Design a protein with these regions (language model features):
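Single conserved hydrophobic/aromatic residue that forms the stacking wall/gate
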Residues: 1-8, 12
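Short solvent-exposed loop/turn micro-motifs enriched in small/polar/acidic residues
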Residues: 22, 93, 129, 172-173
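Hydrophobic, well-structured mid-protein blocks that either form specific transmembrane helices
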Residues: 48-103
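A contiguous pocket-lining binding segment that forms or flanks enzyme active sites
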Residues: 81-149
Length: 173
């Protein structure tokens, strides 16, 4: 893999298109005009884990897709803005859930943000829904992801037969 050959360590990539919420397995499917594509990359370097993703549009997206991705991005930043020593994981989730639901969207319950470092899924667990002043208290030096997965329909997901890919149960974006 080109990224590994550049000294970036082990690299794992996932791609999620449209109603694939997360963990989509890369393939040779040709993307269509208006598709939403999320690329999720995990890098392991010298035993340390990194995790990032980025959302793209293929051509011109629908108004619904633009709205969903705009609100999801806002949810991410509202969650980030709550992060400081003494705040809680519930504060993050509450900020995200409130903004999503105020905009008529739903928050996936089955997947979370997570701590990372020498382990990929370490404490704390970052729910993207919840109540303020609940959950783990954040401390200086914690490293974790905030990964809000916001749906235009209901928040229910199902895992496909590959045992990995998660999609919206109602096939909504």
């Amino acid at each position: 893999d080109e990224m590994s050959s550049r000294g970036l360590g082990d690299v794992y990539k996932r791609q999620s298109v449209n109603h694939v919420v997360c963990h989509g397995i890369p393939g040779d499917k040709i993307l269509d005009e208006g598709d939403i594509l999320n690329i999720d990359v995990t890098v392991i370097l010298d035993g340390w884990y990194g995790d990032t993703s980025r959302m793209y549009f293929v051509g011109e997206p629908s108004m619904k897709a633009k709205f969903l991705t705009k609100v999801t991005y806002e949810c991410l930043w509202l969650g980030i803005e709550t992060v400081k020593p003494g705040s809680t994981t519930g504060d993050i989730g509450h900020a995200i859930q409130t903004h999503a639901e105020t905009n008529g969207l739903s928050v996936v319950r089955d997947f979370t943000g997570h701590g990372l470092g020498k382990v990929f899924h370490a404490p704390p667990t970052i729910l993207h829904y919840g109540q303020p002043n609940t959950g783990d208290v954040l401390e200086e030096g914690m490293i974790f992801t905030i990964e809000p997965m916001i749906n235009s329909g209901k928040y229910d997901v199902k895992i496909l037969s590959d045992g990995w890919t998660a999609v919206t149960r109602d096939k909504s974006l």
